[in-house]
Design a protein with these regions (language model features):
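N-terminal Rossmann-like NAD(P) cofactor-binding subdomain of oxidoreductases
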Residues: 1-191, 227-228, 292-293, 297-303, ...
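Charged docking surfaces used in two-component/phosphorelay signaling
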Residues: 9, 69, 158-333
């Protein structure tokens, strides 16, 4: 089997470290693994498989000879290095939002639109984590009858805001238990024992940038240019795994039983739907998992062809690192 030279840009962050883990778990054919980061992190050492790898400084020259570069860095870093990566001949699988809506860049969820990988011109974008979790959960419905609209409410874990999110949550819980004052730094308000109904800045007509991603990215991934989505994104005091409540309206009626059958057979999904026995998806159960758990499937009482669905997925794994490695697997298939 052919082996590939792989680099991870932003290797020392949470997603970069998870990419290392997933590459090993999936036995990706790596001949060389290069870990790239800022000057602050360069020179450090990270374990991978049975050896230690020294973190290198991210610079244009670092991509020479690479076959695949997995991006786990912020938008500005992705934009800064993308030209050098493409010039080097490597394919850049980027987890940032920098290129997602570029018409020349495929936006890929392997369970949904794997064929779009072939359209790349050197860059393939990884979708937003909430988009991935939501669309994997409902793609089987779209294959049965086209989805016309979605109303979504997301319950997003603090780790989605970076490594500082869980630390701030734990520190606040401890401080409040001791009767101490807290000063939020990562989030705009106290997150312990609270929910914050804003993720991202205002983008369009009262919607935030995070909320518009599900519509904009969903249209591109599912090839549904007329898809309408109304979304509210909420930060909740959960450490890991995002949850999403979805009202999905399809062109033709899909029964609850048919929906359960479709989702149970769908790649990337696990049906957990037994209300009588209190079995349904929860963040605790999906953390450190690659599958999206789907349940609470029931008719929407406000529309003819609507279904209510609840899903949970690990935003660091399937929502980021695993999806990127799956794209890399498609590239070498």
């Amino acid at each position: 089997m052919k082996q590939y030279k792989v680099a991870i840009l932003g290797a020392t962050g949470a997603v970069g470290r998870e990419m290392m883990k997933v590459l090993a778990e999936r036995d990706f054919p790596v001949s060389e693994l290069h870990l790239l980061a800022s000057a602050r992190s360069a020179g450090g050492v990270l374990p991978w498989k049975e050896r230690d790898i020294t973190v290198e400084l991210a610079c244009d020259e670092a991509f020479a000879g690479m076959d695949i570069v997995l991006g786990a860095a912020e938008n500005d870093v992705a934009k800064r290095f993308a030209p050098a990566i493409v010039r080097s001949g490597a394919v850049f699988v980027d987890n940032s939002s920098a290129f997602r809506m570029d018409p020349d860049v495929p936006l890929v969820v392997p369970e949904i639109n794997p064929e779009d990988v072939k359209k790349h011109k050197g860059i393939i974008a990884n979708p937003n984590c909430t988009t991935i979790v939501s669309l994997v959960a409902i793609n089987a419905l779209n294959q049965d009858s086209p989805i016309e609209s979605i109303v979504a409410s997301s319950y997003q874990a603090v780790s989605g805001a970076g490594a500082g999110g869980p630390i701030e949550l734990m520190n606040e819980v401890e401080a409040l238990g001791l009767g101490q004052q807290i000063e939020p730094k990562v989030f705009q308000y106290q997150i312990a024992y609270n929910v914050i109904p804003q993720i991202g800045g205002e983008a369009f007509d009262g919607y935030t940038s995070e909320e518009m991603k599900l519509q904009n990215e969903g249209r591109k991934i599912m090839h549904l240019p007329e898809l309408k989505v109304s979304c509210t994104c909420v930060r909740v005091p959960v450490v890991r795994s995002h949850s999403v409540s979805l009202v999905v309206r399809t062109r033709e009626k899909i029964s609850v039983e048919r929906a359960r059958q479709l989702i149970a057979a769908a790649p990337g999904c696990r049906l957990v739907d037994d209300l009588a026995n209190k079995r349904y998806p929860m963040p605790l159960d999906t953390s450190d998992q690659d599958l999206v758990f789907v349940g609470r499937i029931r008719d929407d009482l406000t529309s003819e062809n609507g279904l209510n669905i609840w899903c949970c997925g690990d935003q660091v794994r399937k929502g980021a690192a695993t999806n990127a490695v799956q794209i890399a697997q498609l590239l070498v298939k």
